[in-house]
Amino acid sequence: MKESLPITLRPNEPMSRHTSWRVGGPAQYYAEPTTPDEAMVLAAWAMTHRLPLIWVGRGTNLLVRDEGFAGVIASYRGQRWALHEHGETAELWVEAGTPMAGTARRLAAMGWAGLEWAEGLPGAIGGAIVGNAGCYGGDTASVLIDAELLLNGSERVVWPVTELGYAYRESILKRPGADGVPPLVLAGRFRLHRADPKVLMARIGAIAAERKRKTPAGSSCGSVFKNPPGDSAGRLIEAAGLKGTRVGDAEISPIHANYIVNRGQARAADILTLIELARTTVAEQFGVMLQLEVRVI
């Protein structure tokens, strides 16, 4: 496997370096392609060597098991963007590796509304498109026009938002392709409209303050579970008496029960134990089976 590639492959790369939980064993190979061509070359290389390939974002919604992953984990890092203005509206084309929150702030300062709800949202554009990220009254599905995808590791296509199967924190992009190679989001196109920059920046500031107030300190992946219909996962976990429960250095936050925080040297196994404890206890006490929002590999 020493053939020359236009992209750096890092063997036995600890995934704890690439997840916001700061846990995770080694990927057999890790790479960060920055262009569609690099992504296609990497996918072809993985298929040639019969190595499973997983595309990830910035690791802000990801738990990698302690044993790591026998294959290739790749994070697409392209960050080009272009704004096409049409009077009082605009279309933003932006690559998947671009930070979501930074994009929201940049547009708000320019007087373009549509993504200000994403202030403080961890991760990048691609992850938001895959998971239909949303908060504070907005979500990806409501402003996305279409997504540029890489299918089967070689076919570039553009799918309109109506074909992405969006639901609460769900899309068909979470499912593997027919040949086992998962789809990769290369870019998205978003619908924006003009607004007063001062009003938008005030909204950004209010959301930032609210996030700071509610978000526990420490390394975490944000909300661990999806909210069940008509209820809150955090409320259920708190009502089950699990706030502050600790396994090793992993803790169900005493501030927000839908957060599990790494207090130092937590292992993925510690976090998984707390996840299973929360699911089992809530199911036993309230008859609700919590569904994961984070991705586990």
UniProtKB/Swiss-Prot annotation:
Q: Which Gene3D superfamilies does the record cross-reference, listed alphabetically?
A: 3.30.465.10, UDP-N-acetylenolpyruvoylglucosamine reductase, C-terminal domain, Uridine Diphospho-n-acetylenolpyruvylglucosamine Reductase, domain 2
Ranges for domain FAD-binding PCMH-type: 22-195
Matching Pfam families: FAD_binding_4 (PF01565), MurB_C (PF02873)
Name the EC number(s).
1.3.1.98
PROSITE patterns membership: FAD_PCMH (PS51387)
What is catalysed by this protein? UDP-N-acetyl-alpha-D-muramate + NADP(+) = UDP-N-acetyl-3-O-(1-carboxyvinyl)-alpha-D-glucosamine + NADPH + H(+)
Which compartments does it reside in?
Cytoplasm
- Among the entry's GO cellular component annotations, what is one? cytosol
| Pathway(s) annotated for this protein in UniProt | Cell wall biogenesis; peptidoglycan biosynthesis
Domain of life the protein comes from: Bacteria
Q: Which GO terms describe its molecular function?
A: FAD binding; UDP-N-acetylmuramate dehydrogenase activity
Q: What residues form the catalytic site here? A: R169, S223, E293
Just give the chief location class. Answer: cytoplasm
Its GO biological process terms?
A: cell division; cell wall organization; peptidoglycan biosynthetic process; regulation of cell shape
Cite the entry's keywords alphabetically: Cell cycle, Cell division, Cell shape, Cell wall biogenesis/degradation, Cytoplasm, FAD, Flavoprotein, NADP, Oxidoreductase, Peptidoglycan synthesis
**Needed cofactors:** FAD
| NCBIfam families for the chain | murB (TIGR00179), PRK13905.1 (NF010480)
Q: What does this protein do?
A: Cell wall formation.
Q: Which family does it belong to?
A: Belongs to the MurB family.
Q: Under what name is this protein listed?
A: UDP-N-acetylenolpyruvoylglucosamine reductase
| Organism field | Chloroflexus aggregans (strain MD-66 / DSM 9485)
UniProt lists the gene as: murB
